[in-house]
C-alpha cells in the first residue's frame, strides 16, 4: 500500500492549491516543502489579481480553492481595474499584507482534511514500470504514492543574478532544486531556461510620501470570494513616483553591468512585466515610467516597514540600483533594504503535457506553475488546482477534469500551453479568450462551481452557499423578466422609449443605455437587492443578445469539433499530409479535432485530410 495517494512537491501558490484540491477530493495527500514557514509566501509583488489574472482568482475560488479567500483575509488595498470598460474585462485586484496572506494560506491548509504537510527537500522521483510511484527526499526518506504533482516555481536549478554576481538559489536565501532538474533532463523532456525579476525593497520611513500623488483603493472593497462576509483589514493608500531622464541615463550607462544585458542570462523574461532595463531600452522614446509604491504589510506587522516599488524589477548591481532610486521623486533619500535581482530557472516545454497537466510520456507525474513556463501567482494557482485534482482523480480511477476554452480562462491557458507551448513566460490576459462575454469574473461560480461539485473538489459548505446564491440570482432574474411597464410609465420617470404600446421588462430597461437609477422608483425591490445580485442582473440584461449569439457559436463549434483523436494516432500514416503538417501534429499531439484546428501553422487541407482519416478509423 502506498504511503499517500498524491504527493505535491513545493509549497508555493501552485503547490498549495494542488495539495488542497487533492485533499478536498478525498485523496490522502502529502505536501512536501523545503521550509514550512514559507508555505504560501508571496515571492515577488504583494498583490493578487488584475486584468485577466483576477478572472483566474475567481475561477480558483469557484472550484473552492484557496487564493481568493486568502486575498480577502489579507487585502489592504482593493481595486477593480478596467472599471470604465465593460464587465467582461473588469479585473479585480487586491494588494495584500504578505504576512497575513501567508498566514491565511497556512490556516486554510491546516483546516483541510486528508492533508499531511512535511518539511523536506525532494531529491529524486521513484519510477517503476514506466510511471512515477514515489519521491525520495535528499535526506534519504522515501514516500510511495499513486501520483506526484511537481510545483518547483523558480527553484528548478535556479540561479539569482545581481549584476555579474551569481548565486545558486530559487529565492533569495533559499537553495535551488538541482537534483530534480537533472532528473527531468535525464527523462529526455524538452526543457529550457526562463527568467523573472523583482525590484529592490525600500525602507518605508526613508520615503518622502507627502508630495507624491495618491493611488487610493476602491471606497467599497469588492471581495474575491462570495464566502467572504466582510473585508476586515484597514485599507492603505499607495503613492506613485516615476523614473526621470537622469534615471534613464544611469541605467543606459550601466547596461553592461546588468545580468540581462551583460550576457549572464540566457533565459527569456516576461514580455508584459519587463525589467526597468528592458523598459529603458525598448521604449527609448519615453522619458519616464511610473513606479507604484506599494506597502508590503500593515504597520506593525512583519514587513510593515518595507515598500515594494512596482515597475522597476532589475538585475543591475546594488550600487547602480541605489543611484537610480535616488533620482526618482520622493525616493531621493530612500534606503534599499534588499537589492532587486533576476532569477533564472528551468522549465519544461508544456507541450510535453496532456490537458490534465500529466506528462504525456510519464504517467503519474503532473506539473503546475512556473515549471510549465507561466509567470504569476494566479496562473500558478489555477494550474495547481487542476493538476492536484486530476492527480487525485487518477489515483481513484476517474477521468480527469478538462476545461474547454469556452468554459474558463483556466481552459484557455491550458489549451494555449499544451498546444502551442511558450517562447517566453506566459501571462493571462482577457485578450487571449475568444469568449470574453461569457467568461466574466462575476460569473465564475455559475460557470465552474457545478463542474467542481461533479468533479469532487467543492466541499459541502461551499456547495450549500452556491446553491443558495444561485437560487437568489435565479429569483432576481425571473422577477426582472416578469416585471413589465407601459411605455408612458417609463417616460414619466425619464426613460426615452417609443410610445408603441409594447410593455418593457426590467431586463429590457437595463439593456438600454442611460441612467438606470430611475428604475428605482418603479421597481424599488430591484434597488434593494444585494449589490452582487443587482450587478449580475444588469450585466446579463446588457449582454443578453451577445450571449445568445456566443452560446450558438460555442454549440456549433462543439458539434463540429468534439471528435476525439486517438492518443497513439500515427500521423505519418495519414495520406495527404505534408511532412511539415505531420511533424506539427506529431509534436502537438492534439486530443480532439478542436485542438487540431488550433495547432500553430495548420492548413485547411491538413484538417480535411485528418478528419477524413479519423472518420475511416471510427
Swiss-Prot record:
It comes from the Bacteria. Belongs to the MnmG family. GO terms for cellular component: cytosol. NAD-binding protein involved in the addition of a carboxymethylaminomethyl (cmnm) group at the wobble position (U34) of certain tRNAs, forming tRNA-cmnm(5)s(2)U34. This is tRNA uridine 5-carboxymethylaminomethyl modification enzyme MnmG. Homodimer. Heterotetramer of two MnmE and two MnmG subunits. The keyword Flavoprotein applies. FAD binds at residues 10-15. Its main location: cytoplasm. InterPro entries: FAD/NAD-bd_sf, GIDA_C_N, MnmG, MnmG-rel, MnmG-rel_CS, MnmG_C, MnmG_C_subdom, MnmG_C_subdom_sf. Pfam families: GIDA, GIDA_C_1st, SAM_GIDA_C. One of its GO terms (biological process) is tRNA methylation. NAD(+) binds at residues 269-283. Keywords: Cytoplasm, FAD, Flavoprotein, NAD, tRNA processing. Its cofactor is FAD. It is found in: Cytoplasm. GO terms for molecular function: flavin adenine dinucleotide binding.
